[in-house]
């Protein structure tokens, strides 16, 4: 995702809207805030390598990690900023276990939507928000390009970070 943003910047391709799911929601939000590619790379390094967000193990009744580190790192990075105040339009998605539907986060506090979008079931605890139990958006829509096309006109570029089937080793 960061590589695609870097290539677009180098090629002078303007980006006027960003959407993301799971890890892509954090990268997209940082870009939509107007951060440079090097800053986004550094923040991701601070969160995922230096911050060790997945090292707060717990008895796996709900998940293998408590999720407090990641929760605090995302909240600290994005502060109390609102999605609707971002310089570039942004949304991210999470899976709503309460309504058994996709939840689109296009307004409200950034860190809450991003934290919900990256709550991988079993790995980390779900996000409880406004009476909803939210998990990683990839459970229902790992590539929200279709949602972007439904909402906005113009070209949509979607970045799928899942490996191609032909790249996996057969069993």
Residue map of PLM features:
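Patatin-like phospholipase
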Residues: 1-21, 29-171
């Amino acid at each position: 995702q960061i590589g695609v943003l870097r290539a677009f910047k180098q090629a002078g391709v303007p980006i006027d809207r960003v959407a993301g799911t799971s890890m892509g929601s954090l990268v997209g939000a940082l870009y939509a805030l107007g951060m440079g590619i090097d800053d986004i790379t550094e923040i991701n390094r601070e969160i995922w390598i230096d911050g060790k967000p997945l090292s707060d193990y717990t008895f796996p009744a709900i998940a293998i990690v408590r999720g407090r580190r990641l929760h605090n790192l995302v909240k600290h990075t994005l502060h109390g900023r609102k999605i609707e105040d971002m310089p570039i339009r942004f949304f991210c998605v999470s899976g709503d276990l309460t309504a058994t539907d996709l939840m689109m986060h296009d307004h409200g506090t950034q860190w809450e939507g991003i934290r919900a979008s990256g709550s991988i079931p079993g790995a980390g605890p779900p996000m409880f928000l406004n009476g909803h139990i939210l998990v990683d958006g990839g459970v229902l829509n790992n590539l929200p390009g279709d949602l972007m096309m439904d909402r906005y006109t113009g070209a949509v570029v979607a970045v799928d970070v899942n490996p191609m089937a032909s790249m996996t080793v057969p069993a």
